[in-house]
Amino acid sequence: ALPIFAAETLKVDWENCEIVRGNTDRHLPYSTYQAGSNTMFTEARTNHLAALDAIRKLKEIAAAELGGVADDYDIDGARVFATADNSRGMTYGEAAQAAINMGGEYSGETYPDNLNDVTKRAVEGLAGTGLIGVVKDSRHEGMPPSMAIGFMEIELDTQTGKYEIVDYSCVADCGT
């Protein structure tokens, strides 16, 4: 369950999370299951980055509503609060309501141009319903990591150091 990366980034207890996927009534596109090394490489980072975008917006909303600048604020999994006085803050729910009132990028009424078309449609469908954290992860460089293991049986001539390969087996996870 790769959404756990977003939950951990937002410091939200996993028990308080609801995963909803593949529900077009809620503007969530159908997708394949999440498994394999390629999925971990691509989707884990994207979930983390979307959560970082939400955190940035939570802090900016708190600064706009409560005063100061975004860097004056932090999160604890349920609230965004002033680091100098943690009694000055707001719940994630209150910040989501403020996002609706503020509009623009906070509520998904505007979003980055470089998003995938499916993601754009999802954001458009969710716009105005709360705080929207959304990004396109374009940092991927190189090939996704893969995992492989090989086993070799040899016959070794201990006098000459020469060997003969008797059997070889290899298993590779090529990603999904």
Residues covered by each model-derived region:
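Cofactor-binding beta-sheet edge motifs in enzyme active sites
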Residues: 1-176
